[in-house]
């Protein structure tokens, strides 16, 4: 029996990965409520196995004809599968770094895993949402769980402050996005499916432009694009490090999935307008994120501005609007997951050992912890785009796609800001590898030996090794990964590329077919 076969009119097989995550969430919740202390120690393993199970179902789903569920509200096309995989993989690595972190912080872990799985579920549904209601519910599920995670360490005033700032800015951006969706609902005469709205916007005039602006504002918040980035540095600095790791990749991946589907499906008639707006946002984001990062003295805050700058690079692929542009965007998010989460795993370990994330306190770390120094150095250099690491090939594909699409200004700004980013990444690496004992910081001088057998430490080490290996070998294997991304773009009809129309004949739903007919023009052609 094929477990992915359509179930009734809802085609429930399309959401099997989400079902696995939901069941895991319920099991974790029940064990945390009724289990003893011994049972609660199994919560990280239960969460991790559930997330790995969801990844397996996503791999199996890749081999099946694409389906829609909830009567056309959710699409399980290849692009959706890849983005959902990114969200799940981010959550799995977050679990690995969270166990030891919250044990040492004295915070209960059960509720955190429930919130993390809830946010993961929201991100997964957001990646495949094809209906206004599904988009909003998924966005709120992801957002509310993220606000609660940001303030999870209640005893830390910085965490409470971060949660409040995140809540206020998030609520404002949600209101703006909701107003844009209400305009779309009115302009289309009450349509909620994204593909059904597009034909009504061809002659919408100023109101249509207004709807686009409001929707871009809401999406820009999720991407931490300038000028919607103000929440990012403070939230990243004050929130627990595992939460920051999830927000920097998982939430951002879901945001880019929403951006691609929403803009390509709803606004094909305004392609030039949203590309022009996003071009300006991309330039501002790359410049501000990378320039301001130079002045940072705390590594978490530096990574916050780095995350803003990285979003600007990824926007190049979205602005290009070509097959290569979308494929390079997805590929870069794949490698960004490995190198950025690897950096946060290292920051987590160092803060557990020293209680600080001041960059100066990393001075001389190589002499006390060569493994941590190696992992953090590789991840930072990859974020800077140095060959032959994964980040270099990710930026190479993005810049090449932008150049082919005629986005010369974006590519040149990207190249200049990439050079700037190398400076502040190398500065951290140089601080860690100083050879003179007298230059060793006080925190490193008192650096305790690492007990890898302590509770939560084996998972942390596995996460560091996995991200280190992925960061190194994703560069070597960049061609197969980019081919996978290209295949996903080609086989997702809502993007409207010619090969997508021939994919899985008879399996594409009417709403996807409508979206495919409103194809984006390729600038490179």
From Swiss-Prot:
GO terms for cellular component: plasma membrane-derived thylakoid membrane. Pfam families: Proton_antipo_M (PF00361). Keywords: Membrane, NAD, NADP, Plastoquinone, Quinone, Thylakoid, Translocase, Transmembrane, Transmembrane helix, Transport. It catalyses: a plastoquinone + NADH + (n+1) H(+)(in) = a plastoquinol + NAD(+) + n H(+)(out); a plastoquinone + NADPH + (n+1) H(+)(in) = a plastoquinol + NADP(+) + n H(+)(out). InterPro entries: NADH-Q_OxRdtase_suN/2, ND/Mrp_TM. The keyword Thylakoid applies. One of its GO terms (biological process) is photosynthesis, light reaction. Its EC number is 7.1.1.-. The chain crosses the membrane at residues 14-34, 42-62, 78-98, 117-137, 167-187, 201-221, 240-260, 276-296, 302-322, 330-350, 374-394, 396-416, 462-482, 494-514. GO terms for molecular function: NADH dehydrogenase (ubiquinone) activity; quinone binding. It is a multi-pass membrane protein. It is found in: Cellular thylakoid membrane. NDH-1 can be composed of about 15 different subunits; different subcomplexes with different compositions have been identified which probably have different functions. Belongs to the complex I subunit 2 family. PANTHER family: NADH DEHYDROGENASE (PTHR22773). NDH-1 shuttles electrons from an unknown electron donor, via FMN and iron-sulfur (Fe-S) centers, to quinones in the respiratory and/or the photosynthetic chain. The immediate electron acceptor for the enzyme in this species is believed to be plastoquinone. Couples the redox reaction to proton translocation, and thus conserves the redox energy in a proton gradient. Cyanobacterial NDH-1 also plays a role in inorganic carbon-concentration. This is NAD(P)H-quinone oxidoreductase subunit 2. The gene is ndhB.
């Amino acid at each position: 029996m094929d477990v992915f076969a359509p179930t009734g009119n809802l085609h429930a097989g399309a959401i099997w990965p989400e079902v696995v995550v939901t069941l895991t969430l319920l099991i974790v919740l029940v064990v945390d409520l009724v289990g003893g202390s011994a049972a609660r120690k199994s919560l990280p393993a239960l969460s991790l196995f559930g997330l790995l199970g969801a990844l397996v179902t996503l791999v199996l789903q890749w081999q099946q004809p694409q389906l829609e569920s909830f009567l056309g509200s959710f699409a399980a096309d290849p692009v959706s599968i890849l983005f959902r995989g990114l969200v799940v993989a981010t959550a799995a690595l977050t679990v690995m770094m969270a166990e030891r972190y919250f044990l040492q912080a004295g915070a209960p872990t059960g509720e955190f895993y429930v919130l993390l799985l809830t946010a993961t579920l929201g991100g997964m549904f957001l990646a495949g949402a094809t209906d206004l209601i599904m988009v909003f519910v998924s966005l709120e599920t992801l957002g509310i769980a993220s606000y609660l995670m940001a303030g999870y360490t209640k005893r830390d005033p910085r965490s409470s402050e971060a949660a409040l700032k995140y809540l206020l800015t998030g609520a404002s951006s949600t209101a703006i996005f909701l107003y844009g969706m209400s305009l779309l609902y009115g302009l289309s005469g009450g349509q909620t499916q994204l593909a059904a709205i597009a034909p009504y916007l061809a002659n919408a005039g100023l109101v249509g432009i207004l709807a686009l602006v409001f929707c871009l504002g809401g999406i820009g918040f999720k991407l931490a694009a300038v000028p919607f980035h103000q929440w990012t540095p403070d939230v990243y600095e004050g929130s627990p490090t595992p939460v920051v790791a999830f927000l920097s990749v998982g939430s951002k991946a879901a945001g880019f999935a929403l951006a691609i589907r929403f803009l390509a499906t709803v606004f094909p008639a305004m392609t030039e307008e949203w590309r022009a707006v996003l071009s300006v946002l991309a330039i501002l984001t790359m410049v501000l994120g990378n320039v301001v990062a130079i002045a940072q003295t705390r590594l978490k805050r530096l990574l916050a501005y780095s995350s803003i700058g990285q979003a600007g690079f990824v926007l190049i692929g979205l602005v290009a609007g070509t097959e290569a542009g979308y494929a390079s965007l997805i590929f870069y998010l794949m490698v960004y997951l490995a190198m950025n989460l690897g950096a946060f795993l290292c920051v987590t370990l160092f803060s557990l050992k020293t209680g600080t994330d001041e960059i100066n306190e990393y001075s001389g770390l190589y002499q006390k912890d060569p493994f941590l120094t190696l992992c953090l150095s590789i991840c930072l250099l990859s974020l800077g785009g140095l060959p032959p690491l994964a980040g270099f090939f990710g930026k190479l594909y993005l810049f090449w796609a932008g150049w082919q699409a005629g986005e010369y200004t974006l590519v040149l700004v990207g190249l200049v800001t990439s050079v700037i980013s190398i400076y502040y990444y190398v500065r951290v690496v140089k601080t860690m590898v100083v050879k003179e004992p007298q230059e060793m910081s006080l925190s490193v001088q008192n650096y305790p030996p690492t007990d890898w057998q302590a509770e939560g430490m084996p998972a942390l080490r596995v996460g560091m090794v996995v991200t280190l290996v992925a960061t190194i070998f994703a560069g070597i294997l960049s061609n197969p990964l980019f081919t996978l991304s290209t295949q996903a773009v080609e086989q997702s009809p809502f993007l409207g590329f010619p090969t997508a129309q021939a994919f899985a004949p008879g399996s594409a739903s009417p709403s996807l077919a409508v979206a495919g007919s409103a194809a984006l023009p390729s600038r490179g052609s």
